């Protein structure tokens, strides 16, 4: 089974982000891996306003090291990157792994 990676934010409602990506990957018969860049929370008491917590690039790098240690990735999808440092970190591994 091919391995596919999503580098994106997490949406606790499952309607977007990593959670939605993993469901889509499963529908297409590929094994989904994920690396989080941010966490999105929503407050139902304020009309579902969003709050985004960005994760540091050092944490993203640790996740990417874990994913790529398991062998090659057939495809990659990016979503909300959170900040410029995460974009640069993801780019480093995309180039390094030749995805």
Residue locations for each model-derived region?
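Short, glycine-rich nucleotide/cofactor-binding loops
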Residues: 8-14, 82
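Extreme N-terminal starter segment of soluble prokaryotic enzymes
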Residues: 1-5
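Residue-level detector of alpha-helical secondary structure
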Residues: 20-24, 38, 59, 63-66
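N-terminal glycine-rich anion-binding loops that anchor highly charged ligand groups
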Residues: 28-42
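N-terminal basic/disordered segments at the start of proteins
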Residues: 14-31
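Ribokinase/PfkB-type carbohydrate-kinase core domain
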Residues: 43-99
């Amino acid at each position: 089974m091919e391995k596919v990676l999503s580098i994106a934010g997490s949406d606790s409602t499952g309607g977007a982000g990593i959670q939605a990506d993993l469901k889509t990957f499963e529908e297409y018969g590929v094994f989904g891996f994920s690396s989080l860049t941010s966490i999105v929370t929503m407050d139902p008491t304020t009309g579902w306003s969003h709050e985004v917590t960005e994760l540091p690039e050092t944490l993203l790098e640790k996740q990417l090291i874990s994913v790529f240690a398991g062998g090659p990735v057939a495809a990659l999808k990016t979503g909300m990157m959170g900040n410029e440092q995460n974009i640069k970190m993801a780019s480093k591994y995309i180039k390094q792994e030749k995805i």
